[in-house]
Amino acid sequence: MMPLVAIVGRPNVGKSTLFNRLVGRRKAIVDDMPGVTRDRNYETVTRFEAPFILIDTGGFEPVSEDRLLQQMREQSQLAMEEADVIIFLMDGRAGLTPSDVEVVEMLRRVKKPVFFVVNKVDGEKIENEAADFYTLGIGTLHTISAEHNRGVNDLMEEVVAALPKSSTRLDDEDITRIAVVGRPNVGKSSLVNRLLGFERVVANPTPGTTRDSVDTLFACNKKRYLLIDTAGIRRKGKTTQKLEKYSVVDSLRSIERADVVLIIINAEEGVTEQDERIAGYAFEAGKACIFVVNKWDTLAKDNSTLGKFVDQIKTEFKYLSFAPIVFVSAKSGQRINRVMEEVERVMAQYSKRVSTSDLNRVFSEAVEKHHAPLSHGRRVKFYFATQVGTKPPTFVLFTNQPEGVHFSYERYLMNKFREAFDFTGSPLKIIFRGRDRRE
């Protein structure tokens, strides 16, 4: 695994600004509201030709009666335990605080490289005020401005030099990316924590607790996965605050990054219009999909309950009729193992390649059994087929009239391919391409 670098500090000292600066894009949400970053946020970064995983954390506050603040503190402590190198960020404008002193004392006992950094140092006056931090007696003190990129490269050059040498690099092709999406408060974070076996994401009954997309690398059955827990996708009318708008965009980007999308549905509420919108995003992006119906244990059930729920999903999501459905309880752990079993099975289909000879045999049989409808009075002829890609499996079918193939016939061919080659759980893409008779 690549080495890990954790950025920790009090709320609103600029951790996410530094994180975004190093990542090179808006990955963590930045806002003046303290506590905006609540979970640990992971991203792969390369600096000075050295790849490493950067961790952004929620604010590290003194012990508080507020449960959410306590959880954020616990997340920061976990990040420090995971990390190979720690960047402790302080606020040059706010000055030295008792919280800073408390954390510094704790970090003195950590047996790993720690970089003490004063952020928001933008001018000579503030530089002088940052002198208060030298009273901590911590030796080397770095002053930077993450917002204006002052001193950041010098800091990171030293951080990279302190990284343990990694013998292996993260192979993107070897990792299955799983996005966990759904409306707020359907149990996404609880499901993630149950899958991982520990509290990786802050789970709280308040809707919208997870604001950023949170990435976690883990292994299951000797295979590697990247689990992306997204902020809940709300209705457009409810995303008036800029913070919520960023979260929705981040959720949609997470779907784009994923191979497999877990669409979480609240069993207590059934399928909603917003569930359909979320599933539509995943379908349009060409992702393998699995419906995960959570809180199944809370329903009063009879012999027909399961069948009715399956029928509702199949009816509302006709375009995702190929997607498997798993009924779970993230809270109790009921049938949680089925989720990763389905992910593994679906990913195998999503990555599958079919031999050209087998593909053309099935293609020819399908065309012979049911000819394509005429187009403008002309017969649509097909010549041969080839698979040109995976994730999703993509096929090019050569024909004399690529624009004349009716969508219903495309669906017919897709169903034949799915049936013949067991593409359960995976979308398929068909491209009709013209071919001159002389070719």
Curated annotation (Swiss-Prot):
Record: residues binding GTP 1: 9-16, 56-60, 119-122
Entry keyword set: GTP-binding, Nucleotide-binding, Repeat, Ribosome biogenesis
Domain named EngA-type G: residues: 3-167, 176-351
Pfam families: KH_dom-like, MMR_HSR1
GO biological process: ribosome biogenesis
GO molecular function, a single term: ribosome binding
Binding site for GTP 2: 182-189, 229-233, 294-297
InterPro entries reported in the protein's UniProt record: G_ENGA (IPR031166), GTP-bd (IPR006073), GTPase_Der (IPR016484), KH_dom-like (IPR032859), KH_dom-like_a/b (IPR015946), P-loop_NTPase (IPR027417), Small_GTP-bd (IPR005225)
Keyword Nucleotide-binding: yes
Residue ranges of domain KH-like in the record: 352-436
CDD domains in UniProt: EngA1 (cd01894), EngA2 (cd01895)
Family per record: Belongs to the TRAFAC class TrmE-Era-EngA-EngB-Septin-like GTPase superfamily. EngA (Der) GTPase family.
UniProt subunit comment: Associates with the 50S ribosomal subunit.
Purpose of the protein: GTPase that plays an essential role in the late steps of ribosome biogenesis.
Protein's UniProt name: GTPase Der
